[in-house]
């Protein structure tokens, strides 16, 4: 490992330590939203839960200084502009399946248990969505201009039909850049 790689690892470690509480706070914000598919409503094609989760994720991303867009409630995204309009998209989703039985606590109230975040969506896929945003935030804070635009996509219908992803192929969302 050369000195540049060692320095980068130190920067990442420092960022993770500094961001730990924010990561947990933002995960809790999303996990605490019951984003199970519901009845369609204006701006909420998969129900109000997925809509609220999408709005919350976009608010978190906007607070990090990322460019955000809500594509009619189907999908949203947060961009970290790069040196070119080419994009690398990191796909996440904010909808969850119904909680089912076997929970010892409220599945829509994230808690920490033995050092682990517990709640519906912590692993699939709200937790990874938050971590992906923090990766973009790391590059932004470091002043790194990637050779491409980094786009974090937030789906709202992965668990029950993937109709959100279809929007990417039928609209300008895939080509739109800030």
Label each PLM-derived region with a short phrase.
Residues 102, 162-166:
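Short acidic, glycine/serine/threonine-rich loops at helix termini
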Residues 169-178:
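Single conserved hydrophobic/aromatic residue that forms the stacking wall/gate
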Residues 2-120, 141-146:
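Acidic/His- and Gly-rich active-site-bordering loop/insert found
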Residues 90, 115-159:
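Alpha-helical metal-binding/catalytic segments enriched in His/Glu/Asp
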Residues 77, 97, 159-161, 177:
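Flexible, glycine-rich phosphate/dinucleotide-binding loops
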Residues 7, 127-130, 163-164:
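Residues forming well-ordered secondary-structure scaffolds
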Residues 28, 58, 130-137, 166:
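Predominant activation on well-ordered alpha-helical scaffold segments within soluble catalytic domains
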Residues 83, 137, 175-176:
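Charged, amphipathic alpha-helical interaction segments
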